């Protein structure tokens, strides 16, 4: 596994743009204070792309199944080719921390609970929605003291909490290239016989796995592609 633009020239075939795939993302902001914290079953979005999954914070950014699957969408939406240079990235992703509730549902719940549970501290109330180890960071980013009672939080601050629960954003500055798990792009499939994996341009030349412009989400799909195309290529070559 991994992502490297090297050796594609050896294929003697037309090759699509080579890009990072299933890659952790590096953030502009230092996240070392919450490294190791996991958010479960959240929805991560970039423009119109949305992925549901877990997010793990690292010392340099974001990883976990949800992030690395979304990274494919991000990578494919950006015009670049690793055969030429690394991409320059300056973008924003958003995390819906409460995907089971609509914005209106969350607003209604906040309004009810802030009246009924006025003496409750906000850091304790947020345990209904967030993992404990993320609450302090979330409140710091929202500009609210963790020991504030619900009754003392004004409307503007309450709305900011709701907005951040539904759309908590991070600025992304690059892919974590050393930890990218697959390569997006490769030998153009239209020049490969799918029944044999043999090149349509050069007889007795076969391709398999990530040399091809084939990739999938995390979860063993890329290994399956490698095993199946490798088996087919080897079997086809042995027939000749």
Regions found by a protein language model. Give the residues of each.
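Predominantly flavin-linked oxidoreductase catalytic cores and closely associated redox partners
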Residues: 1-134
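A conserved FAD-binding loop/helix module that cradles the flavin
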Residues: 1-11, 214-240
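Domain-scale detector for complete catalytic domains at protein termini or as standalone homologs
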Residues: 2-3, 124-125, 134, 173-174, ...
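Short helix-capping/linker segments at secondary-structure and domain boundaries
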Residues: 75-77, 142-147, 239-240
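A glycine-rich dinucleotide-binding beta-alpha-beta segment and adjacent secondary-structure elements
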Residues: 136-215
């Amino acid at each position: 596994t991994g992502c490297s633009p090297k050796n594609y020239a050896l294929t003697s075939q037309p090759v699509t743009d080579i890009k990072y795939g299933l890659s952790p993302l590096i953030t502009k902001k230092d996240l070392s204070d919450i490294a190791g914290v996991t958010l479960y079953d959240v929805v991560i979005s970039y423009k119109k792309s949305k992925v549901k999954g877990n997010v793990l914070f690292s010392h340099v950014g974001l990883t976990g199944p949800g992030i690395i699957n979304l990274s494919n969408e991000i990578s494919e939406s950006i015009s670049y080719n690793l055969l030429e240079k690394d991409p320059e990235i300056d973008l924003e992703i958003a995390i819906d921390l409460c995907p089971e509730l609509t914005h209106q549902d969350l607003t209604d719940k906040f309004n009810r609970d802030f009246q009924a549970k006025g003496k409750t501290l906000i850091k304790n109330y947020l345990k209904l929605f967030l993992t404990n180890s993320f609450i302090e960071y979330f409140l710091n980013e929202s500009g609210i003291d963790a020991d504030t009672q619900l009754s003392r939080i004004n409307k503007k601050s309450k709305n900011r909490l709701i907005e951040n629960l539904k759309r908590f954003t991070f600025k992304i500055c690059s892919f974590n290239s050393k930890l990218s798990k697959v390569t997006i792009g490769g030998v153009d499939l239209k020049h490969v016989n799918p029944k044999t994996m043999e090149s349509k341009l050069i007889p007795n030349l076969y391709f398999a796995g990530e040399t091809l412009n084939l990739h999938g989400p995390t979860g063993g799909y890329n290994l399956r592609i490698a095993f199946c195309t490798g088996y087919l290529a080897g079997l086809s070559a042995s027939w000749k």
